[in-house]
Amino acid sequence: MKIDVLTLFPEMFQSPFEESIFKRATDNNLVRLEIHNFRDFAHDKHHAVDDSPYGGGAGMLLKPEPLFEAVEDVLREDPTPAPVILLSPQGRSFNQEVARELAKHERLIIICGHYEGFDERVREHLSTDEISIGDFVLTGGELAAMVVIDAVSRLIPGVLGSGESSQDDSHSNGLLEHPHYTRPPVFRGWGIPDVLLSGNHAQINRWRRKESLRRTLKRRPDMFEKIPLSKADRKLVDEILAEENTQG
């Protein structure tokens, strides 16, 4: 996958993507990241990319000309089709389902917002998608872009060392992950569930599924309501509710 990022602060992307999993992905040509400073496409003497809004009001807006020219230049260099994604608090909520959707593309073009936002013509005539990573305010879209890039890259075949790694992550199957334990078996008097030491893989898998259901039901009831439960899942949920009632 090729990912083009349009930003005013290209230096922000250097360190995070030169380490760990993403570096291996780029070294193995699984992901190609190209950063473009769209200030290079501002042609006045001050290289201004923003201006005050018509009708008045606080703040500045990103002008349409530099962004349109930047995207057009990127597509001229490489005409591979790609969704043009605005990172904006007005966008659809980013989640694992959206990450899977984006991972199916050969290429992404991501525009990082700043100031009070974009001239509306960018939204109407340039972008094809608009994404928000949450209901909070950031100084710019760079951190949001990093979140999207990281989440999407993990889903590209070959990026992770284990084929099961991304499938077992929280949210990948609609559930939060089950608890994990490693050595030592007892730490400061705190042990681990006996089933994990039993060697019985069927029982271990049952325990993991049950704890995923328990954790999702308790921490993310909104997610739990959307999960299609099998007959075995419903039995586990009944056990969980009975245990919770006993403890309560």
Swiss-Prot record:
GO molecular function, a single term: tRNA (guanine(37)-N1)-methyltransferase activity
GO cellular component, one term: cytosol
GO biological-process terms attached to the record: tRNA N1-guanine methylation
Catalytic activity: guanosine(37) in tRNA + S-adenosyl-L-methionine = N(1)-methylguanosine(37) in tRNA + S-adenosyl-L-homocysteine + H(+)
Transmembrane region(s): none
Alphabetized UniProt keyword annotations: Cytoplasm, Methyltransferase, S-adenosyl-L-methionine, Transferase, tRNA processing
Subcellular location field: Cytoplasm
Top-level division of the source organism's lineage: Bacteria
Signal sequence interval, chain numbering: none
Pfam family, one: tRNA_m1G_MT
Sequence positions that bind S-adenosyl-L-methionine: 113, 133-138
Enzyme Commission number, as recorded: 2.1.1.228
PANTHER family for the chain: TRNA (GUANINE-N(1)-)-METHYLTRANSFERASE
HAMAP family per UniProt: TrmD
Function: Specifically methylates guanosine-37 in various tRNAs.
Quaternary structure annotation from Swiss-Prot or TrEMBL: Homodimer.
Record family assignment: Belongs to the RNA methyltransferase TrmD family.
Entry protein name: tRNA (guanine-N(1)-)-methyltransferase
Annotated source species: Dehalococcoides mccartyi (strain ATCC BAA-2100 / JCM 16839 / KCTC 5957 / BAV1)
